[in-house]
């Protein structure tokens, strides 16, 4: 039995929730998110709370209910506060700059790299070595950050590359002669 699914999700003021079968739409100040859930999950709205439970006779229904509850909680946080990921570029000549709806990156390749941003994700470059991504969908913001990081993941010897601001890159010792 999922302990996560047993806790209800509180709906703060200013957030609108629409339930349509297994589809849930949450609208808030930062945007609107829609998601369809597994049909083994029963979602009910009571006053300012959403409750989750399993449908009878469905295998792994408690696990699905716990997953649904966690996803809905992230949707509520996303439309009220939003999510932020910060990337830091480390290396000689590594730079980032905004180019319209894309992030332009100079990463030591023979060509500049441009990463197009999907709808719902905004980026800003407070300095040439920082990228701040914001959006209301946690999964999309995290995926864009991972895609940008994958162009030049931090290497373990000098630590050059793109890393998350809170990431700790373990460094290796150089080979001895």
Swiss-Prot record:
Pfam families per UniProt: Ribosomal_L6
What is a single cellular component term in the Gene Ontology annotation? cytosolic large ribosomal subunit
This protein's source sits in the domain of life called: Bacteria
Identify the Gene3D superfamilies for this entry. Ribosomal protein L6, alpha-beta domain
Which cysteine pairs make disulfide bonds?
Answer: none
SUPFAM superfamilies registered for this protein in UniProt: Ribosomal protein L6 (SSF56053)
Keywords, alphabetical = Ribonucleoprotein, Ribosomal protein, RNA-binding, rRNA-binding
Q: Biological process (GO) annotations? A: cytoplasmic translation
Q: Does the keyword RNA-binding apply?
A: yes
A GO MF annotation of the entry reads: rRNA binding
| The keyword Phosphoprotein belongs to this UniProt entry's keyword annotation | no
Matching InterPro entries: Ribosomal_uL6-like, Ribosomal_uL6-like_a/b-dom_sf, Ribosomal_uL6_a/b-dom, Ribosomal_uL6_bac-type, Ribosomal_uL6_CS
Give the protein family. Belongs to the universal ribosomal protein uL6 family.
Listed HAMAP family: Ribosomal_uL6_B
Quaternary structure (record): Part of the 50S ribosomal subunit.
Which NCBIfam families did the record assign? L6_bact (TIGR03654)
Q: Its function?
A: This protein binds to the 23S rRNA, and is important in its secondary structure. It is located near the subunit interface in the base of the L7/L12 stalk, and near the tRNA binding site of the peptidyltransferase center.
Protein name according to UniProt? Large ribosomal subunit protein uL6
Source taxonomy: Bacteria, Pseudomonadati, Pseudomonadota, Gammaproteobacteria, Vibrionales
Query: Encoded by which gene?
Result: rplF
């Amino acid at each position: 039995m999922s302990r996560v699914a047993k806790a209800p999700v509180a709906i703060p003021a200013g957030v609108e929730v629409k339930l349509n079968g297994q589809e849930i739409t949450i609208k808030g100040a930062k945007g609107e998110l829609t998601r369809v859930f597994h049909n083994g999950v029963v979602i009910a709205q009571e006053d300012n709370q959403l409750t989750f439970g399993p449908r009878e006779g469905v295998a792994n229904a408690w696990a699905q209910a716990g997953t649904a509850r966690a996803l809905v909680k992230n949707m509520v946080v996303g439309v009220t506060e939003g999510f932020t990921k910060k990337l830091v570029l480390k290396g000689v000549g590594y730079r980032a700059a905004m180019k319209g709806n894309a992030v332009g990156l100079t990463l030591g390749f023979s060509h500049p790299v441009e990463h197009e941003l999907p709808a719902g994700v905004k980026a800003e470059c407070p300095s040439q070595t920082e990228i701040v991504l914001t959006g209301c969908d946690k999964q999309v913001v995290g995926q864009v950050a991972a895609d940008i990081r994958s162009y030049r993941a931090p290497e373990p010897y000098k630590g050059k590359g793109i890393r998350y601001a809170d990431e700790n890159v373990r460094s290796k010792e150089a080979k001895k002669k």
